[in-house]
């Protein structure tokens, strides 16, 4: 067994990349491989865990989804109805013909509904903030 020097780390997930890094950190602790964390290593690590069926680690990555109901994909609508998702707001007055939702959930819920969407989020996570949404329409 290789001993890794202990450190104190406070992780915050203020964006998708931060959430994925948090999930990697939790997974690396589980597998006792903290010493392998490098910039960007979360992409390869999390995709490997998904391929092995260890998707519970994805619960450490919070996901915030917002948009009008009539513009959401069927996956997003199903995620909204998941028992693990939480509504923050349902603004009915923004557009009379469609509700605007803010949904808080985690990447495992997204994966369970659409593995392809979850993998795409992991692979595009090197972009920050609004760039992610601009790139995906």
Q: For the regions a protein language model found, what residue spans apply to each?
A:
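Family-specific signature for flavin-dependent thymidylate synthase
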Residues: 1-137
């Amino acid at each position: 067994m290789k001993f890794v020097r202990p450190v104190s780390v406070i992780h915050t997930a203020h964006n998708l990349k931060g959430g994925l890094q948090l999930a990697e950190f939790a997974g690396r602790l589980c597998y006792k491989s903290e010493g392998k964390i490098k910039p960007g290593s979360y992409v390869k690590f999390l995709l490997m865990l998904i391929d092995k069926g260890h998707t519970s680690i994805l619960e450490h990555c919070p996901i915030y989804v917002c948009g009008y109901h009539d513009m959401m994909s069927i996956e997003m609508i199903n995620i909204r109805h998941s028992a693990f998702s939480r509504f923050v707001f349902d603004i009915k007055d923004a557009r009379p013909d469609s509700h605007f939702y803010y949904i808080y959930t985690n990447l495992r819920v997204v994966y369970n509904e659409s593995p392809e969407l979850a993998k795409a989020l992991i692979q595009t996570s090197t972009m920050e903030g609004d760039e992610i949404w601009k790139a995906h329409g």
